[in-house]
Amino acid sequence: MARLQLAGSRRLVPLPRRAPRLAPLLLPLLLALPDGARADCPCKVPALCRPMTHRPDFEVFVFNVGHKTWKYYDWSQITTVVLFLKYDPELMCHAHAKGARVVLKGDVPVKDIINATFRASWIAQQVKLAKTQYMDGINLDIEQDVAHSSPEYYALTALVKETTDSFHHEIKGSQ
């Protein structure tokens, strides 16, 4: 066992000799990851973790409600998959491989979005979730009644604009 040394410049615990040699090897690998792809990408091909940037002439949305039914979709027709339930990394990788976007379902109580601070926090959480899960945007699905010219009406308009601005800024090409 090493003795404690209080004075002097000698190290008490020697540094591992191999660690410094690995750093120069790992850095180019990390830098070679495509934009938007991180080391924790669940896809076999890391490029599939990048956001989809193409803009189709028309949109065909599919609303995925779980299970593995997506394996039977006609992927030649689909441009966007909206996830209504649990995130499925296998679905995200497959959709991106087929050229389709995968987006969050955004639903929030209208009474809560009147508060601008709450709205900003909710949007930030959605952006963070989308980025963490390599998703391509959000589909706002608010099905609550909103009276014309009510505070909720203007808050909903603000929510759409602020969400769009935030997603477009944080995830290039997002919906």
UniProtKB/Swiss-Prot annotation:
Transmembrane segments: none annotated. SUPFAM superfamilies: (Trans)glycosidases (SSF51445). Keywords: Glycoprotein, Glycosidase, Hydrolase, Lysosome, Signal. Residues 39-175 form the GH18 domain. One of its GO terms (cellular component) is lysosome. Glycans are attached at residue 115. It comes from the Eukaryota. One of its GO terms (biological process) is chitin catabolic process. It is found in: Lysosome. Residues 1-38 form the signal peptide. Its main location: other. The active site is at residue 143. One of its GO terms (molecular function) is chitinase activity. InterPro entries: GH18_Domain-Containing, Glyco_hydro18_cat, Glyco_hydro_18_chit_AS, Glycoside_hydrolase_SF. Its EC number is 3.2.1.-. Belongs to the glycosyl hydrolase 18 family. Involved in the degradation of asparagine-linked glycoproteins. Hydrolyze of N-acetyl-beta-D-glucosamine (1-4)N-acetylglucosamine chitobiose core from the reducing end of the bond, it requires prior cleavage by glycosylasparaginase. This is Di-N-acetylchitobiase. It comes from Bos taurus (Bovine).
